[in-house]
Swiss-Prot record:
PANTHER family given in the database record: ECF RNA POLYMERASE SIGMA FACTOR SIGR, RNA POLYMERASE ECF-TYPE SIGMA FACTO
Protein name per Swiss-Prot or TrEMBL: ECF RNA polymerase sigma factor SigH
Gene expressing this chain: sigH
Region described as Sigma-70 factor domain-2: 34-96
InterPro entries listed in its UniProt record: RNA_pol_sigma-70-like, RNA_pol_sigma-70_dom, RNA_pol_sigma70_actinobac, RNA_pol_sigma70_ECF_CS, RNA_pol_sigma70_r2, RNA_pol_sigma70_r4_t2, RNA_pol_sigma_r2, RNA_pol_sigma_r3/r4-like
Inducing factors: Expressed at low levels at 37 degrees Celsius; 5-fold further induced after heat shock (50 degress Celsius). A longer form is transiently induced by diamide (at protein level). Autoregulated. Part of the sigH-rshA operon.
Length: 215
């Protein structure tokens, strides 16, 4: 048998996905994540109108690049990365003023649950009083955090992303994510404690402030 006889037949190229198939796959996999993505957009823009615009632009970009997304990898993290980059590039500089939005759009009780533990991991009487706060107060405290802390807390404590995926979404080292999350949770806890004190749920100095010593 000659070398010519031993030549293997060429493997036929894989059939390219049609536009109809791409659309069906996008609707099946990406569209169900719209509500969660809107929550992230609202946390970034702090304005419902901007959040809707940001989400729409994100989904247009996601659809345009959906052929490059590898099935079996984390679609949610992929979409959040597009959302975050779109916000940074397009909306951060022209952001509208924050406005009120319905309190039932996003539930943030996970934030208080993660923020209400002391450095020893034990719940104190003060932080247990935070459970009396309504979700609107928790939302307001989260919005008061610096952006980099706010988004780290949101991705970890609301969306449940692990550090590695948050680092990919925010395009920062894992160590930076851990630092932002630690500082963000601590600031959130202090803010919530201050609100609880104003509401009469906590007595004494604010968390993080020294007790007054009398002679």
């Amino acid at each position: 048998m000659t070398d010519v006889d031993r030549v293997e037949p060429e493997t036929p190229p894989e059939r390219e996905e049609t536009d109809a198939e791409l659309t069906a796959r996008f609707e099946r996999d990406a569209i169900p994540l719209l509500d969660q993505l809107y929550g992230g957009a609202l946390r970034m823009t702090r304005n419902p109108a901007d959040a809707e615009d940001l989400l729409q632009e994100t989904m247009v970009k996601a659809y345009a690049g959906f052929r490059s997304f590898r099935e079996g990898t984390n679609l949610k993290a992929w979409l959040y990365r597009i959302l975050t980059n779109t916000y940074i590039n397009s909306y951060r500089k022209k952001q509208r003023q924050p406005s009120e939005y319905p309190t039932d759009e996003i539930t943030d009780w996970q934030l208080a649950s993660n923020a209400e533990h002391s450095s020893t991991g034990l719940r104190s009487a003060e932080v247990e009083a935070l459970e009396a706060l309504p979700d609107t107060e928790i939302k307001a405290a989260l919005q008061a955090l610096p952006e980099e802390f706010r988004m780290a807390v949101y991705y970890a404590d609301v969306e449940g992303f692990p550090y590695k995926e948050i680092a990919e979404i925010m395009e920062t080292p894992i160590g930076t994510v851990m630092s932002r999350l630690h500082r963000g949770r601590r600031q959130l806890r202090d803010l919530l404690a201050g609100v609880a004190r104003d509401r009469g749920f906590i007595r004494g100095p604010q968390l993080g402030e020294p007790e007054e010593v009398t002679s």
